[in-house]
Amino acid sequence: MLKLPDRGTLGISAALWILIGASSLVQAAALVKIDGSSTVFPITEAVAEDFQKAMRGAVNVTVGISGTGGGFKKFCRGQTDIVNASRPILKKEMDECKAAGVQYVEMPVAFDALTVVVNPKNDWSKTITVEELKKMWEPAAQGKVTRWNQINPSWPDEAFKLYGPGSDSGTFDYFTEAIVGKAKSSRGDFTASEDDNVLVQGVASDKNGLGFFGFAYYIENQKKLKAVAVDGGKGPVLPSVKTVEDGSYQPLSRPIFIYVNIKSADRPEVKEFVEFYMKNAITLVKEVKFFSLPAQVYTTNMDHLNRKKVGTVFDGRPEVGLRIEEVLKREASQ
C-alpha cells in the first residue's frame, strides 16, 4: 500500500525545494555591478553587451553612470565590483577605500582625447589657446567674462554659453587641472550634466555654445558639432588617432581606466567579465571611437589581477600631459 508522507515530511520537503529553487535563482542571476564615468561608459557597455551574449544570460552586467567621483564613492563603499574612471584614483578616494577595506587592481583600458566643441554655425573660433580656455572657464570669469570678444577681440560681441560635466566627473577634474591649473577650479555659471548626451544637445542647439567631453561623444555627433583645435603652446592641434598616439594633442589627451575590487574578482562572473574585457578591448575600444592601448597593456592588466597586484601607479591627483608610453612604463613596473 502506498504510504503518503506526513505533514512534517511535507514541510521539510517543501523547505528543501524552496532552498534549491532559491539557489538556482541566485546562480541564474549572477550579477556584475559597475558604475562611474560617463566617458568610459561606452567602452564598458560595449564589453558588457558582448559578454552577456557570450554567457547566454547566465550573467547580468549593470553599467551605471554617476561620474568618476560618484563611481568611486560607491566602489569604496563596496556597492559595486568595478568602477569606470576617466582619471586615476584620488588620494581621498584611496583613503576611503582603505578605511573600508576595499583593495583594487588599476587597469588602463584606453586613451581619450578630451574634445572642445562648438556649434557648426560658429565660424570664428576654429582654434583656441589654453590661455583663452582658461580665461573662459576660470572661477574669476564667473559673471564677468560672458562674451566672445572678451576672450579674443576678433570674435563677435555676443554672449557665449558654456556646457560641461558636473563636479563629480573625472573629465571635469582633468579639464580644470589641465586648463585652469587646479582640479575642480571653475566658474559655476555653466550648464552642467553627468550625461554627455545632454551636453551634446546643448551645444548642438545653441549657436553660441561651447562645451567639452570625451572624443567618442564628439565622433558620434560630429554632424551637429564642430571640434576646435587646441593650441597648447606649439600650434593648434585637432584630436585624432595620430595626434593622440604621437602625443601632440596636449594637454587634453589622457588615459582612462577601470578599477576592479580584488574581493569581487574572486567571484567567477567578475573574473570572467574582466578576462573578456581585456581579451576584447582592442577591438571594442576602437569600435566605440576611443584609442586602444598596445596589446601588452591588457595582458599586463590580467597579470596584475591574477597576481593580486593591488594599488595605483599614480600619486593621488590628476596628472596632465601623460603620453601612452609613460602610462605603459608605469604599469609595467608596478
Model-derived segments and their meaning:
Residues 1-9:
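N-terminal secretory signal peptides that target proteins for export/translocation
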Residues 3, 21-24, 309:
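Short, flexible coil/linker elements and helix-boundary hinge sites characteristic
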Residues 11-24:
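Bacterial N-terminal signal peptides
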Residues 28-334:
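Flexible loop/hinge segments at secondary-structure junctions
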